[in-house]
Each structure stands twice: as structure tokens, then as C-alpha cells.
Design a protein with these regions (language model features):
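Sec-dependent signal peptide recognition
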Residues: 2-8
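Generic structural marker for isolated residues within well-ordered, non-membrane alpha-helices
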Residues: 6, 100, 169
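Hydrophobic h-region of N-terminal signal peptides that target proteins for export
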Residues: 10-18
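Intrinsically disordered, low-complexity boundary segments flanking structured domains
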Residues: 11, 53-57, 147
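Surface-exposed repetitive/solenoidal architectures
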Residues: 20-84, 105, 125
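Structural signature of tandem-repeat unit edges
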Residues: 38-45, 62-75, 85-98, 108-121, ...
Length: 240
């Protein structure tokens, strides 16, 4: 029995010794993870896109508390930091132009977020299930809020949608249960299916005359007043 214990300990020590703490994450990018949970992405250019079948090398990074991205990184890949549940701080530099699908999905300890004006694309479900996120400002470089981008951000109370946005995707803010009000800018023409569904605290929505398409169930299971401008004949003001 003693020999079995010794073998098990040796095996565990070997696994620990072989655990990777650095490597590559793009053609010209490297990553390094410290023992105290700081993940650094360094180099120049775009990150690799990851997926369910091709996880990032630091996946299952419950100990990642902070992410530092060099100011020469241009894209954050799909699924890059998915389920980094202990993450509380991330800097997104002004060099980043695109944030991939599911990039920060399930980062449930992230409370605040600054998206720089360099970002033009925020992928589908990029920040979904960031349960502790309380506010977010979307830069005026973004034209589309993708499907599910901020869905199930349960603590989100405030969101700023800039005048550059023309489309709010399906489920973009679905199940943001703490969101109390939202102003849709006059640049928006399309609001997708279930975009604000299950936003149970939502009390007011202003829909501008620019909106020509409101998809099914956009405000499903919400108790709210929505107002439109006088010139918006397609969606007159109602009290539901």
C-alpha cells in the first residue's frame, strides 16, 4: 500500500511539473501565466481562434485573476478567455480591433470593463454570462452589437449604446435582470429577436424613429413602458 501511495505522489508531481505555464497563442504571440494568476499575452498581431474542440492552452483557468494584453495585439480570438471564472481585471489595449465570439463568456467575477475605441467588432456571446459585470460602455467604433454579446449579465444595471450602432442582435441583452432602463440611439434601425427578453427590471425603453424592424419577442417577459418619437408611426408608444 505504501508503494502505491508513493507512486501516486510521484505521478501527481510529474503532472504538476509538466503543466504548461507558457507557449504560443498566435503566429507572433506568446502567453505566460504566473503562479499568482496573471496571464500575459505579448507580441504583435492576432490571437488564435479557439473552440470547444480546440481549447486555449490555459483553458480551465480558474486561477487566472488578471489578464494583461500587449498594445500590439490586434485581435482577441474566439473562446480566448472563456470560463476564466476568477478573472477580475483585464486591460484591452487600443490596438485591439476585434473581440472574438465567446471571448470572455463565463468570466463570472469580472465586475467592470472598458472597451477601447479601436474595437469595431464584438463577437457573438463575447461577454455573455459575465454575471458580476455591472456596467459597460460600448465605443462609438462599433456598428453591430452581436447576438448574445451581453446576454445573461445578471448584474448589469447600465449600458451605453453609442450613435454608431445600427443593429442590436438577437438576445444581445437577454436575461440582464438588473437592467432598469435603456436608450436606443437614433442610428439603430434593427432590434433583434429576444434582444431584451427577460430583462425583468426594465422600466423604460425609448425607441427612436430610425427603428424600422423590431423582431419577435424583443421585450418578452419584461414589464416596461416604451416610448417612441412622434415620427415613428410603425411603433407607436404603448404602455404594457
Amino acid at each position: 500500500m505504501k508503494q502505491i501511495y508513493i507512486l501516486l505522489i510521484a505521478l501527481l508531481m510529474g503532472l504538476s511539473a509538466n503543466a504548461k505555464s507558457s507557449g504560443t497563442c498566435g503566429p507572433n504571440l506568446k502567453w505566460h501565466l504566473t503562479d499568482d494568476g496573471v496571464l500575459t499575452i505579448s507580441g504583435k498581431g492576432g490571437m488564435t481562434d479557439y473552440s470547444y474542440s480546440n481549447r486555449s492552452p490555459w483553458y480551465d483557468g480558474q486561477n487566472i485573476k488578471r489578464i494583461i494584453i500587449d498594445d500590439s495585439v490586434t485581435t482577441i480570438g474566439d473562446d480566448a478567455f472563456n470560463e476564466c471564472s476568477a478573472l477580475t481585471s483585464v486591460n484591452i489595449p487600443n490596438s485591439v480591433r476585434a473581440i472574438g465570439n465567446d471571448a470572455f463568456r463565463g468570466c463570472s467575477s469580472l465586475t467592470s470593463l472598458t472597451i477601447p475605441n479601436s474595437v469595431t467588432t464584438i463577437g457573438k456571446y463575447a461577454f455573455s454570462y459575465c454575471r458580476a459585470l455591472t456596467s459597460v460602455t460600448i465605443p462609438n467604433s462599433v456598428t453591430t452589437i452581436a447576438d448574445g454579446a451581453f446576454g445573461s449579465c445578471y448584474a448589469l444595471t447600465s449600458v451605453t449604446i453609442p450613435n454608431s450602432v445600427t443593429t442590436i442582435g438577437d438576445g444581445a441583452f437577454s436575461s440582464c435582470g438588473a437592467l432598469t432602463s435603456v436608450t436606443i440611439p437614433s442610428s439603430v434601425t434593427t432590434i433583434g429577436k429576444s434582444a431584451f427578453s427577460y430583462c425583468r427590471a426594465l422600466t423604460s425603453v425609448t425607441i427612436p424613429n430610425s427603428v424600422t424592424t423590431i423582431a419577435d419577442d424583443t421585450f418578452y417577459n419584461c414589464i416596461y413602458n416604451h416610448r417612441t418619437t412622434k415620427t415613428n408611426q410603425k411603433y407607436p408608444s404603448v404602455n404594457l
